[in-house]
């Protein structure tokens, strides 16, 4: 199997402004218009409710819509393999049937009801797609064993491998062979099945770097021949996947950088270094998925509290406001999910914890209403504001008359800083509604683990 080795302070106020009728410097045509100021919410059906079903999750849709969620990403909804299964319920990513529905979650009509309800309430809904491997009891194992990668030394089908073709401990899955044209075409047809049968709006592709860019170019073009607005997210940081017409790639490096800055093993200069690399390697119109949590991080690397501590909201503000960013919220993040959810067993989210939905709704509304913060090249240029504190990151973004200025303090103490390079204007404090003046240079005080977001002008 050929693998890719390419390196790849806050109160209760909300403001709004009208959306522009025209967009200058619009991105490539493959980005759907509805995605330009969208956010994403990852849904873990198994752990979301005590029932762990589509129907039970569906009752949460009005709450999520009120919070401002746009795109629902459902972790895999297909049946999970039994052979070599890990744990009692198994991994969502061990797919037994690409076209089936996991009976743990409900049936075909339950899923169709969820998709229809989501669309009626204004959401887009995408599903996880796992192209790299299947369960050991997938029908292809007996019907088309040539679809799988066989170890040249032993002739045996191998366990799932990473996107550098290295062995893993994924003993519950078998590796597919992306040098087999029939298998690749079968994958495309299975993806089309979900678009045609259930009208899903796109796919989050697991381990998208495990296939060739040519495969994804052909596949995505094929999918867009059926629905030009299908949305494609790659779980990968390989820049070339944008050239294959993925709308968005993962910001893994930025996530780990936030963990380090919050944990004081790095200062904010590393953010500038990261942005310089991104500007060099990634297209200006490519969306980047920024997050402080997701299913991988929560289950395997610890909670947000463990990794980021009291800086969670400060870090998330960067996920909302940074250049090219689309912010992601994971299931339970809006109640401060305080445990690592078990991956192979039932482990229901505790929704009785104090709600942080007010913060998240204001943050998402900021993204939605400020044209300077729009996704990809829809948004405005980002300009650094210099400070004399290595724990404070500050910048402005500008689109037309719209200015968004952000100060984030990763220190556990209140700080008074000197700054320079701001845009001298009259602003509104987004989170308090108070009027504020900001000169080009001066001093400003920020609360511990806090942030200040100032807005000016129309979107």
Give residue ranges: language-model regions.
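Short, flexible loop/turn elements at secondary-structure junctions
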Residues: 45-49, 78, 102, 131, ...
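Substrate-binding/active-site clefts of carbohydrate-active enzymes
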Residues: 21-40, 44-55, 59-70, 76-198, ...
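Hydrophobic faces of well-ordered beta-strands that scaffold small-molecule active sites
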Residues: 39-41, 72-74, 125-127, 203, ...
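Short, solvent-exposed turn/loop segments enriched in Gly/Ser/Thr/Pro and often Arg
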Residues: 73-87, 128-138, 206-212, 235-240, ...
